[in-house]
Amino acid sequence: MDVTFLTKNVQINGTQFKILLQNGQGECALIALANVLLISPAHARYAQEISRLVRGKETVTLNELVQTLADMGVQNPNGTDVDKQQLLQILPQLYSGLNINPEFNGSFEDGVEMSIFRLYNVGIVHGWIIDGDNDPNSYEHVSKYSYMGAQKVLVQSYEIQKNNAQFENSEQIQSDAPYLKSFLARSATQLTEYGLTHLREILVERSYAVLFRNDHFCTLYKNNGELFTLVTDPTYRNRKDINWQSLKSVNGSQDSYYTGNFIPTSLERTETTATGQNESYISNPFSDQNTGHVTSNQVNSGASGVQQIEDDEELARRLQEQEDMRAANNMQNGYANNGRNHQRERFERPEKNSKKNKFLPFNGSNKEKKRDKLKKNCVIM
């Protein structure tokens, strides 16, 4: 049976769109990419096929989505040299698990995975960045690494300490490892305060991108200088008032839900007034429409409503904190588990050269760039 995705009708800044929702796989790169193409005005000209695919449908299959994106890829001005069959092979990986490698200076290690986003002219960003302004010492030790590179150093450091292993750069490994371990522990959500600021700077107002965070991918949008992620959880499919979640904090403690027009909302369902003109969480006893006397029951009901909203928001924060804890535990345990001999052998073997797969345009010169310079001049349109 083919994998399927539910669709949802949303209104964003007064315009109607249909988006795709995640399934049990979670927030995957395929859905994040597809939704940018579906709702971004900058991509409307080249995204007519995917818009036709979802129009009038309650569900879309993985095969339909991949076939449509592949057709769009070869027709895209950036895809003149693209092999459709090879594109059909890699696009499903955006659903099953995309192997990307964020670098702690704000960029990504280049490769075929990055070329997918270039093909569709969709930016991919992350905020897992070390703060070079307030912690220059840590920046010197951390910014030159990617996540996979950091894991390799931690494994090698473990081998040096436990098994007296020797590497060509053992001194450098032992010097950098404590800073890397500390940084990973302090950024369990794969997002830092400095990274949040960086994201606000590089995204143009009312622009879209794909955000990598917590080993997941989501559709990111900038509105009035603030960042929002598209809500694709099928739990909220019937909630027309929940379309966005703000991205104001690294742990979700300050994040809240918004309508498609960026009006704050709540997990609690809103109730329509008798006139059908207004929606509110609590009826206003001082409204001109309330011609009766205000009773103690009304006041208590209002207070209960406020408490329910706070409880719902606290639940959302706790769920986010649990996810952050899970990610932190995975990272803390990962480097030790990888210290087994077969992992050591894998790290010591020459890495596979991603240039060999030439089915997509790939600029391998990224390896030669200056890693100690944060890409603040890279603006996502």
UniProtKB/Swiss-Prot annotation:
Residues 342-354 have a biased composition (Basic and acidic residues). Residues 331-381 are annotated as: Disordered. GO terms for molecular function: cysteine-type carboxypeptidase activity; cysteine-type deubiquitinase activity; K48-linked deubiquitinase activity. It comes from the Eukaryota. InterPro entries: MINDY, MINDY_domain. Keywords: Cytoplasm, Nucleus. It is found in: Cytoplasm; Nucleus. Residues 331-340 have a biased composition (Polar residues). Residues 372-381 have a biased composition (Basic residues). Its main location: cytoplasm. GO terms for cellular component: cell periphery; cytoplasm; nucleus; plasma membrane. Present with 7620 molecules/cell in log phase SD medium. This is Uncharacterized protein YGL082W.
